[in-house]
């Protein structure tokens, strides 16, 4: 075989082709356009319109060129095999401000809601920091992008909440009585423990009755004519609200050993409805021998009718409202206004006629015709006894309560007299701070009465619970709730009666989820604690305590006070009243 020459092989190669496999210019594969690709590329998407936007907020032309030009997600790597590379023509280049301006929506002068994190480095749609929800509360002198809480002067960083910061009171209220250094705290009970107590007590029995009653004016039950509402009148009538230990009837019953515990319905209802209360209040407890008296101080807050105490945004004092709140809408001013309304509404809604007057067993025990110049108000006092004994008690434990009723009404079926408790709810300004989102009574009272009453149950839960408890303690047959509004929302001088609604006390208690068994359980627990504290004391020794509701926490505190506590305050109050009387006479 002849030897193979390398020169012959090289000479036999085609001169027009290069070294390697045969090159094909066909870009079709079985009739389908074919593009070269790399096996390392991730396939599966026809196009990608969600390119990475981590640097999207960095403005400028260089950022645009770096992030958005020549982005080929489908193909060989991140470079383009098909784009035509042309020289950049900068002849028509101009700087354009592409900064995104976000228009913040505000409520009034400030206060929108934005969803934004603590750190603002990322772009739109990011997760943000821990505080995912912040409220913008810009005032007149603040920027629109300030956060709600600016107490720490943090600017745009917002407020970092600490341990149990949510449980701290939003506002600081003053206690109803100044805690003195010589008082010693004996017990502290939170409302959660109180709400678990229960004692099923009987309905009670009447011991004696005093006073008289007029009949209720049924014309107030009718819907008033528009723009012709009845004005609330200020009537001069003699009405009394004497504390327990100064009641001559209770003193007589105590001497006869008719009961061991004595109280009035307004004091007892506050204690039974304590878990619903928000404002501070106090009850003086006197233990003398084997008798326990639940008393109140002179000028105590128990005598005032609160307004929107349980509202989520309760009325503010002037110092707390940054000068925007009018003085007539503060809690103290509203309480005085509501007390005035309740006193006069009960007097105005009865028909004062001597021929339609029903006398109780005894006359009014507090009225002295020789000293008083004003006529007596329609009021009936019922002294009722309740048995708080347990099966384990060696001796019965009875309680006498002075209850009150305001008017009578004829039963339309059998014609019998039914006793009523008359109270009034008041509207000050449905658009003002502290209104609790209440509806406009003038336009909604008769078309949406259920919604109006439901709102009042929410905003005045404690007040309505006390009134219902007082009606049940008095064994009243019905309740009349008046709806009284200001004639002018900016003035507390004149009021109009918009309507009256009637309820049965037991049914009304069921509507507002009022459990009287829990209230009796609270009373029995306090009584047992007082008796246990004085178990080793002498029988004739007088010990005095005060039960105080914390103004800022749902807590009751029991203090031991000196036996002569509050007597100086009562004497000073009497001297002040005498001085005022002398000045008026002069």
UniProtKB/Swiss-Prot annotation:
Compositional bias of kind Acidic residues: 566-577
Main location class: cytoplasm
Domain of life of the native organism: Eukaryota
Pfam family, one: eIF-3_zeta
Region (Disordered): 107-154, 566-586
Ranges of compositional bias, category Gly residues: 108-131
Alphabetical keyword list: Cytoplasm, Initiation factor, Protein biosynthesis, RNA-binding
Molecular function GO labels: mRNA cap binding; translation initiation factor activity
GO biological process: cap-dependent translational initiation; formation of cytoplasmic translation initiation complex; translational initiation
One GO cellular component, as annotated: eukaryotic 43S preinitiation complex
Compartment(s) of residence: Cytoplasm
Region (RNA gate): 301-315
Recorded family membership: Belongs to the eIF-3 subunit D family.
UniProt comment concerning the protein's domains: The RNA gate region regulates mRNA cap recognition to prevent promiscuous mRNA-binding before assembly of eif3d into the full eukaryotic translation initiation factor 3 (eIF-3) complex.
Subunit: Component of the eukaryotic translation initiation factor 3 (eIF-3) complex.
Described purpose of this protein according to its UniProt entry: mRNA cap-binding component of the eukaryotic translation initiation factor 3 (eIF-3) complex, which is involved in protein synthesis of a specialized repertoire of mRNAs and, together with other initiation factors, stimulates binding of mRNA and methionyl-tRNAi to the 40S ribosome. The eIF-3 complex specifically targets and initiates translation of a subset of mRNAs involved in cell proliferation. In the eIF-3 complex, eif3d specifically recognizes and binds the 7-methylguanosine cap of a subset of mRNAs.
Protein name: Eukaryotic translation initiation factor 3 subunit D
Organism: Emericella nidulans (strain FGSC A4 / ATCC 38163 / CBS 112.46 / NRRL 194 / M139)
